[in-house]
Design a protein with these regions (language model features):
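Structural beta-sheet core signal
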Residues: 3-5, 84, 113, 234
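Short secondary-structure transition/capping motifs
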Residues: 55-66, 87-91, 115, 119
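Mixed-charge interfacial surface used for oligomerization/domain docking
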Residues: 9-33, 90-103, 109-112, 118-287
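N-terminal glycine-rich anion-binding loop in soluble enzyme alpha/beta folds
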Residues: 2-66
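Active-site cofactor/cluster-binding pocket
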Residues: 64-105
């Protein structure tokens, strides 16, 4: 089997290659013109893109995955069972439409489509676990059961420093974005029961408060689900590795096992996620 994912995936390139994940890139546009962003571009190019994202004079947008790019990816594994797994459909209805069209018009591919129901770090921890299961030789029927379990027991929480992102996406008024930025407010978001929909869970003044909240939410979830262990990914965009590594260290000191990795964002589809954040996606296991 072969795993295909979109570049919303926040794994670093070395991990993508080690897990043999085929990644299809979301197109990126700067002021209407195509911008050469990719998961394997050097860090200097990622830093340059982040500055472009922060510049309010620029309009940086993405579009859905392109039909020709999906077909090219599937063609590489035409003789295999393909697990094509993508972030929550509500995040990109255009991608959902293109995927449906490709699946309908190309019966020569043996494809199983999976909607991960999650975004960024949570999407990433799901894809990573699916790719590991495939690499370890898990049979298809068992894999689909595992996918359902992982998806229904995964949560996404994050700290957003770019309050103007919340304004751009309609989650915050302009006045509050201006005042909040001046006061250095950090917004906290969480996944909800509605797949792909993030909701506000408050605001904090510093990363210590943010990480305290994240730890408490995880502990509460573990109690509610009678969890025994956790698998997690922290993704970072912008200068927030100090915050992310503090969270990783604290996760490692909890009373239950937490397997967690920190990954630098690939940046390739971040216009709708803001250029300054770190987030945590985790799956709780009761076995």
């Amino acid at each position: 089997m072969k795993v295909v994912a979109g570049s919303a995936l926040q794994l670093e390139q070395k991990t993508v290659k080690a897990l043999d994940i085929e990644v299809v890139e979301y197109p990126l546009y700067l002021n209407g013109d195509p911008y050469p962003a990719s998961m394997d571009m050097p860090q200097e190019a990622k830093d340059e893109l982040r500055l472009l994202l922060k510049d309010k004079k620029n309009k940086v947008t993405t579009s859905g995955l392109r039909e020709q790019d999906l077909i090219a990816a599937y063609s590489k594994s035409a003789k295999e069972k393909i697990i094509t797994i993508h972030q929550a459909g509500k995040a990109s209805t255009a991608t959902q439409q293109v995927l449906k069209q490709v699946l309908t018009q190309h019966p020569e591919f043996d494809i199983e489509f999976v909607d991960a129901h999650h975004l960024t770090a949570a999407y990433t921890v799901i894809v990573q676990q699916v790719a590991e299961a495939v690499q370890n030789g898990m049979e298809f029927s068992e894999l689909m059961e595992q996918v359902e379990y992982i998806r229904s027991n995964t949560r996404h929480i994050g700290a957003v420093y770019d309050l103007f992102y919340l304004y751009r996406t309609g989650r915050l008024g302009l006045t509050k974005a201006i005042l909040g930025s001046a006061m250095k407010i950090i917004a906290l978001l969480s996944s909800s029961k509605d797949p792909g929909v993030l909701v506000s869970i408050g605001k904090v003044k510093n990363y210590i408060q943010a990480n305290n909240r994240f730890i408490q939410l995880l502990q509460d979830d573990m109690k509610q689900k009678e969890g025994k262990r956790v698998r997690a990914v922290i993704s970072v965009i912008g200068p927030h590795f100090k915050e992310a590594n503090d969270l990783k260290e604290r996760l490692g000191k909890l009373e239950f096992p937490v397997q967690v990795e920190v990954h630098a964002s690939n940046h390739s589809n971040m216009p709708h996620a803001g250029p300054d954040f770190y987030d945590l996606g985790y799956t709780i296991y009761d076995r």
